Amino acid sequence: MSPEKQHREEDEVDSVLLSASKILNSSEGVKESGCSDTEYGCIAESENQIQPQSALKVLQQQLESFQALRMQTLQNVSMVQSEISEILNKSIIEVENPQFSSEKNLVFGTRIEKDLPTENQEENLSMEKSHHFEDSKTLHSVEEKLSGDSVNSLPQSVNVPSQIHSEDTLTLRTSTDNLSSNIIIHPSENSDILKNYNNFYRFLPTAPPNVMSQADTVILDKSKITVPFLKHGFCENLDDICHSIKQMKEELQKSHDGEVALTNELQTLQTDPDVHRNGKYDMSPIHQDKMNFIKEENLDGNLNEDIKSKRISELEALVKKLLPFRETVSKFHVHFCRKCKKLSKSEMHRGKKNEKNNKEIPITGKNITDLKFHSRVPRYTLSFLDQTKHEMKDKERQPFLVKQGSIISENEKTSKVNSVTEQCVAKIQYLQNYLKESVQIQKKVMELESENLNLKSKMKPLIFTTQSLIQKVETYEKQLKNLVEEKSTIQSKLSKTEEYSKECLKEFKKIISKYNVLQGQNKTLEEKNIQLSLEKQQMMEALDQLKSKEHKTQSDMAIVNNENNRMSIEMEAMKTNILLIQDEKEMLEKKTHQLLKEKSSLGNELKESQLEIIQLKEKERLAKTEQETLLQIIETVKDEKLNLETTLQESTAARQIMEREIENIQTYQSTAEENFLQEIKNAKSEASIYKNSLSEIGKECEMLSKMVMETKTDNQILKEELKKHSQENIKFENSISRLTEDKILLENYVRSIENERDTLEFEMRHLQREYLSLSDKICNQHNDPSKTTYISRREKFHFDNYTHEDTSSPQSRPLASDLKGYFKVKDRTLKHH
């Protein structure tokens, strides 16, 4: 398979896992799930989905099994990778330790692991287990920082002594140290940098305190990376994983603090002047064992160097074999971490860099120093370096201990050779065991890859099922929305029905009042029924005497009962017809009310028109007093006004006739209602008589049939009358509309008369002016200016008063439209003349 197809399949598996985790979280009520990495943004939103429990359980079981297998493989791969890196680093350090110690004049104090107390061995085993879960990110950070710090960056002008003395201390096993807290590098004249340290070795200065190094120190901060630590099985969320990692780190720090405390105690014991001088210090049994162990190590320092060189060559061969295996393991590790999405982009990039560096670095004498930079620096050796600082300060305070330190360093030189050979033998066995375990792990990895392919094939139908379930959930949500809309519509309908029910209650109250009236009538009918029952008893006594005729009468009675049932059905039909008639009656009443309202409105309009006519009459009287000179014109106007009055009187007479007709209609309706009620009462009385009289049932049935026919005919007659009334109402409405049109025409005619009056007034003024002008001319001709002026002034005063009175009244002001009408009328009159 090509790498592109593999990536596609991995992406499909990841998408399926994400969708399945969303489904599980929604079914179990989990609101948020996802990874805490901001680069991947795996923040799952809570989705309320309705899904079957069986499918969810199957998905959950398969996911748990798949993820458990994946986490186991990750653990195994990480353990193998960390252990191989440790073995390589330690083997390289051991190869270079003799030369390194000879060049730097360093002496290492060691102890054999088998002679350690049982308590310390148990602590070491627990620490081994915990450190297997640490990742290789510390390597990358140390590589980057150490590669950047070259020899040239460190000051060369500082005078530092080349001899460093060490003391015998308790050390832990090499496989437990993976993290580095602080790396402190001391420069010197003869060496570039102290690059790598082992858990078995610790450096202590023997130089006098006045010759301490004043150079700057390069401190490398601890770089942390966390790998999922499985305490109680598979963690469902990354928050739980982070919490477990924090707990693991706290435990590691506690163990580290305990080890630092032990080393401090050993240093205090070894550097205490009372112990060295007087020997009065009471040591604990643990400390006595430690001191005895140091003495035994000093005795075993005279082994052959040829055996040591052979073992070192064997170690180099093993290292060459392990390097390609380390590359394959790192590839598997990266492959599984991609599937889990628990490696960040920076970690992936650094992992690739680490693989390239491992490929490029051969194990030769030239590159041994470069490999030292890439090796893992153990934590406890670094803590010992920190302790060297404190011991340097203590020795500044206690300068008299320098001689004793030099004596101890000479004793430690003898124990170095024995310790290295035994360490090489133990590490060769350790490497062989790890090779076997790595082969088994490769087989397991291949099996797990085949299982992963099977799981991918099984996950495809699960993808389709999840998609179908999601579609079903969407359809259910749409149905819910539709139901909510239907609910809102039903609520609106309910509000309308409540209003309708209130109206029905009002009508029901009216029906109850009618029902009370009918109950009174029923009481009277019951009294009649009692009387008829007495008569019935008498008839039964007579019937007892006529038992011979009973058989014949029973057959007749059956026929009569059938006819009675028919009659009762017809009576019910009559009742329904009566109700329909009542409804029609109510409609007629409503129409009559409307007609009355229209009548009242017309009466008001007539009153207004009459008031306007009265005002016109008053204006005409004023015009008569003022227009004595124009009597002929005014007489014509009066004649026209008389005609108008006659038309108005005719309209009022027509309205009075309409009112009388409406009153007749109302009286007719009232009489019709009374007749209907009387007929209903008669029908009820007749029905009770028909039911209770058994002797004259046959005759009464015939009479009832005749009455039914008569009522049907009466109903038809009433319907026809109702139709006639409706037609008459339509005619009345038409007549009312005609009257309104006539009224509008009359109003227009009155307005035209007013316009003509205004034109006549205007003509009168014009004639007065012409008369005054003519009189002035005549006066001038007779040469009588005094009279003319007197007359002209008098007439002018009269004319001014007249015009002032005319202009003061707003009705006498002619409009432009009236003037135009006046000139048109004048032109027409001139043409007629």
From Swiss-Prot:
Keywords: Coiled coil, Nucleus, Phosphoprotein. Signal peptide: none annotated. The modification Phosphoserine is found at residue 609. Residues 431-778 form a coiled coil. Expressed specifically in testis. Also expressed in tumors of different origins. It is found in: Nucleus. One of its GO terms (cellular component) is nucleoplasm. PANTHER family: CILIA AND FLAGELLA-ASSOCIATED PROTEIN 58-RELATED (PTHR32083), COILED-COIL DOMAIN-CONTAINING PROTEIN 110 (PTHR32083:SF32). This is Coiled-coil domain-containing protein 110. It comes from Homo sapiens.
